[in-house]
Structure formats: structure tokens, C-alpha cells
Design a protein with these regions (language model features):
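Sensory-module boundary signal marking interfaces of small helical input modules
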Residues: 81-84, 134, 185, 250
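Cyclic nucleotide signaling catalytic output domains
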Residues: 167, 194, 198, 204, ...
Length: 255
């Protein structure tokens, strides 16, 4: 077979290749390429191993040098792979039901808030919000309705929290709020009361109308703990004290 025939077969073979492929000679001359490569805008032929094109797609460029000094360039669309990786990262740090940060991300946000407070000589408040009698309600309504109720609770609580603060799902019927950069403890009580008011409004689940309440425990950095673990533990103790004293109230640790 002549060189011309070999080249013709090569061009035909890669013409309909599913990825963008280009074969170049040692002097950089384009010998053959797939239709997909030919259709690429030059701006989409980046030099980086992975890059985002002008139209938003993620592409991976692989370049292999041949024995004769030529090269094979492969550009693969990895947009779906990137989306899957982003989804996996999101799930690693967020609750699947509510979309809120999970305990893992909560711990990280607490550490960040404490570091900021130490630099600026401020306080950090950790609030644990436990819904009163939710388990019995969940058993009565069914888990599907209970999940819908928890999503609505999460949305209402989120509306009470500043962007700089963190609302997380800490347990089945428990939410945590980290209020950072506090100057005064009274500001934390205002936040707690807003959370209670948000839950006091009537809920609708299917054809049912429901009322919810919550017991809230609060701990403060640095007075009640020097790290996130201590703050969460003491907020939990304060929350249980609120339940012991009749529920539907706010209690500060040690008070």
C-alpha cells in the first residue's frame, strides 16, 4: 500500500471519531483530523490539560508525541464528568434532603468562624434548633410528609440567616446555626427569636395544617468553648435544658 493510500485510510478512519482528534507532522503541519476537531473554534483548542471553552463546555486536551516527531492531539468533552464530580463534592458536604450544609461542612464553617473571631476579637454563637415532638408528628404523617415538612422548615430558617452565617442540618429533626462576627450577645437572642417566629407560622403539608415549635440551645465563643466541638456540645446541653423547662424556648448555656 502506498503512503498516499495509507494517509487516505487514516483520514477516513478518524474522520468520524467521537472526540476531536488531530494528527500533525513533525513540523506542525496538520495531516488529518476528525470532523469534530475541524468544527472546533480555535479558541476551544487550549493549551491547558483541562480548560473551559467560550461556550461553557469543559474540555480535556491530551497530546502524544510520535516516534517520527509528529503528534496526536485529542480533545475530549468532559462536561458531564465535571458535573458529576461537582455533584459528588456537593453531596459530600450537604444534606441530601434539604440541600443544607451537613455536619462535616458545619464543623469546617465553625472552625473558620472561630479563627475570624480570634483575629477580630469578636464572638461566635452556635445555636441548635430541635423541633418539638417532630418524631411523633413524623410517625403520624408518614415519612414522605415529614420530609416535605423538614424541607419547608429549612427554607424558613434559611430566610432568617445572614449570608455570612451558616445554617446546617445537624440531625434528623435538628438544625444548627453559626452566627459569626458577633459584637453583642443580645444580637444572638434576636436571631434565635427570629428562628422561633419563622417556625410559629402555620405549615401546610398536603391537606393538613400544622403548627411547629422548637427548643433552641445557644453557646458562645469564647465564653462557652474554645473549639467547634465544645460549642456544639454545650449548645446541645442548653437545648435539652430548654426542653426540660417546657420546650418552645431559648436557653443559653450555663444560664
Amino acid at each position: 500500500m502506498s503512503k498516499a493510500d495509507e494517509l487516505r485510510l487514516l483520514r477516513e478512519a478518524i474522520k468520524t471519531f467521537p472526540d476531536a482528534v488531530a494528527i500533525r507532522s513533525a513540523d506542525g503541519r496538520l495531516i488529518a483530523c476528525s470532523d469534530l476537531y475541524a468544527g472546533l473554534n480555535p479558541s476551544m483548542r487550549g493549551d491547558s490539560a483541562e480548560y473551559q471553552s467560550a461556550d461553557g463546555r469543559w474540555l480535556r486536551r491530551t497530546l502524544r508525541t510520535l516516534d517520527d516527531g509528529g503528534s496526536v492531539e485529542l480533545i475530549a468533552d468532559i462536561t458531564e464528568l465535571r458535573r458529576a464530580e461537582q455533584a459528588a463534592r456537593f453531596l459530600a458536604y450537604h444534606d441530601t434532603l434539604t440541600g443544607l450544609p451537613n455536619r462535616r461542612l458545619l464543623d469546617d464553617r465553625l472552625r473558620q468562624a472561630i479563627r475570624l473571631a480570634q483575629r477580630r476579637d469578636r464572638m461566635v454563637a452556635t445555636l441548635l434548633v430541635r423541633l418539638d415532638d417532630f418524631r411523633q408528628l413524623n410517625d403520624t404523617l408518614g415519612h414522605g410528609a415529614g420530609d416535605a415538612l423538614l424541607r419547608e422548615v429549612a427554607q424558613r430558617l434559611a430566610a432568617c440567616v445572614r449570608k455570612a452565617d451558616t445554617l446546617a442540618r445537624a440531625g434528623a429533626d435538628e438544625f444548627a446555626v453559626v452566627v459569626c462576627d458577633l459584637k453583642d450577645k443580645a444580637d444572638c437572642r434576636v436571631v434565635a427569636e427570629k428562628l422561633q417566629q419563622a417556625l410559629a407560622a402555620e405549615f401546610r403539608v398536603g391537606n393538613r395544617r400544622l403548627r411547629l415549635a422548637a427548643s433552641i440551645g445557644v453557646s458562645l465563643f469564647p465564653a462557652d468553648g474554645g473549639d467547634g466541638e465544645a460549642l456544639l456540645r454545650n449548645a446541645d446541653a442548653a437545648m435539652y435544658r430548654a426542653k426540660e423547662l417546657g420546650r418552645n424556648q431559648v436557653r443559653f448555656f450555663g444560664r
